Amino acid sequence: MKILLFVVLFFNVLVGIYSIDTTIFTVCLNCKDGGIIKNVTLANRCSYLICKDENVDQQDQLTRSFSVKKRLTNGYIFDVYKNNQCSTRSNAFEMTKALTCNGEWLELNSFIKVKCGELDPNSSPSPSPSPSPSPSPSPSPSPSPSPSPSPSPSPSPSPSPSPSPSPSPSSSLEESQTPSQTPTPTQTPTPTQTQTTTPTQTQTLTPTQTQTPSQTPTPSQTPKPTQTPTQTPTPSQTPSQTPSQTPSQTPSQTPTPTPSQTPTPTQTPSQTPTQTQTPTPTQTPISSRPMSISTEKPSSSEEVIQASSEFNESSSEDKKKDSESKSSQSESPSPSASASESESASESASASTSVSVSASPLPIMDSSSSDSEENVSPTPLHKRGTPPPPFIHHSSSNELLEKNSDGNSSCKNIPKYLLIMVSLFLYFLF
């Protein structure tokens, strides 16, 4: 666009210079008695008459104003306003021929005066005969003043060739008037072209503005996929929480891939289901058992001691097993109480101790836990499939130890999911 505008401006400058240099004007002045009448012919444009006379009506009809723009070597450049013939403003023109005003100031209008230039060397011998032929053709195109016919008969026989060139400018005047009307439409479209170019520029600007916002949302959409891979550290946060809660690792890893893949377009819902849904199933069953063990174990051990003491005092008809059970009961509360005290001392590491004890001394902890559970409620043994002994409430811990020593009933008492959880925990640790 800039190159095109530069080319257009350069072309206009060239055309303006060419028009100024090549426009030729024929100036016909009657310089006798101070040059009252000046007949000026603009080449191919307009023909107007400047009258510095008392006849104001003629002056108002033909021309109104002139403004001097630039002085050249031979003349001046004018901007011409015509009321009758040239309604639009004509371009600047150059006075190539000097004004024959004898070096005096010629008043073009009531407020503008132009000093006459020097005469050309070719036209210097002809200032005296020039007024004589000029009035002779002047009556034909336009009315001439009364003093003009008086000098015409005196020099008419001498300059016989002069009338021959004199009609030529008169004919040029008539010809110039006829094409003067034709260029008027040529001047009128020039403002229309300028008006058409301006809306085209405004219309070209509007689509460029609409295209730029269409490009701006594309970078706004691109950072959205870049933010989705940043959600990958969410699994890195889950293993940091899993070592604190050892059993909760296995269920937390299994449901996490399903919600993480589904809410990839949305950022917030992908994080919320992993934190809310996974801990609830894992923490409730696991936290309930160590709490029941820690709270019920001291009470269960005391109840076992009281029940065993009352049973030993009341039952004198039992065999040697009852006496051995009394001795074993005195020994059994100590590990159960120590285990319960060790678990109640550190509540924060309850899950870790329960898993470690169940990993290495499985029969001992299972015996204590099964003892406490059997003394509290007989239902777990019925559910596990083992037949209940004849006196479940008064059963001693020695019988349970004997069952665990066989190795057959110890594996039945442990649920399968606990073994799977312990094995997975050991697998992830090592």
From Swiss-Prot:
Q: Where is the composition biased (Pro residues)?
A: 124-168
Chain intervals with Low complexity compositional bias: 169-253, 263-285, 326-370
Task: Say where the protein is mainly found.
Answer: secreted
Q: Where is the composition biased (Basic and acidic residues)?
A: 316-325
Q: What is the protein's name according to its record?
A: Putative uncharacterized protein DDB_G0290521
Region feature (Disordered): 119-408
Q: Which spans does this entry mark as compositional bias, Polar residues?
A: 286-303
Q: Which residues form the signal peptide?
A: 1-19
Q: Which UniProt keywords apply?
A: Glycoprotein, Secreted, Signal
GO CC terms, sorted: extracellular region
Kindly list the places in or outside the cell where this protein is found, as annotated in its UniProt entry: Secreted
Give me the glycosylation sites of this protein.
39, 312, 408
